[in-house]
Amino acid sequence: MTLELLECEELKRRLKIGKEPCDSCQPDLLPSYIEDRVPKGCLVAHIGLCLLELKSIEIVDKIIDRDLIIGAILLHDVGKLTRGYREAPTRYPHNVYSALFILEAKGLEEHKYELAISTLLHHEYYEWKKTYKHRETDMLASIPYGTTELEGARVEAFIDRVKSINEQIKMNINGVLNLLRNNANLVLKEPGRRLKGFRVTNISIIAKAIVLSYLLYLLDNRAAFFRKRKFEWLKNEFMKLTWKPEKLAEEILTNKNIEVGIRYVFLSLLPDYLKV
């Protein structure tokens, strides 16, 4: 089989393996995103790349429990395994249903709220204060999201393939995957009602959620850029620059051609830049 999925190509390159990452590639079964109603990419490869990006950030263990981030990586896109997302992604946004899964899953108690908050808000992490202050959950609660369910067969395929690629990555993932398997057919009802009552005031939980949201956004976007070769090209161009680090950081923060959220992803490359 010739690899046509850029995420799979990058995963194969990063793992330094001579075969396809999965035994059988089925993008229609496990797409990493849907564009114009067409399933695209590979969710398993995306998760694998997120885990590899985590391995590349050495400072993580000094600021937050690595297993907590691994849990966030494995669960933040669970909403993409629902029937609703596959059929109508805009009506069933994956981050909302992923957060709802975390809140409703049986067997998940420790760090439930940190994981749910970071999953719900990780796309907007760089505006977390404004988002949380203006009651993002109230806004979400006002939208008439429907009821949907995880598709058990797709969940099992996801688990099997993630386990397979993790043989090379070697992360501690079995506990989270067992949780997912035990809730493989979970029905996700009335997210608006559930989120309306979801309010966390414990400062310790909020602080962890903020850090987790930042890291999840960073890892998610660094991995997602490989879908269209965008990140690899930008990273290569980035490394060619000979500016001093402070000059480079200033350019990243002030260049109007770089989207606000993407600036943080580029700043995360500075440690690699300094090693060159």
Protein language model annotation of sequence segments:
Residues 1-90:
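Acidic/His-rich, divalent-metal-binding segments that scaffold phosphate/diphosphate chemistry
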Residues 7-10, 15, 35-42, 86-105, ...:
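Divalent-cation-assisted or electrostatically stabilized phosphate/pyrophosphate-binding catalytic cores
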Residues 31-36, 59-238:
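Divalent metal-dependent catalytic cores for phosphoryl transfer on phosphate-bearing substrates
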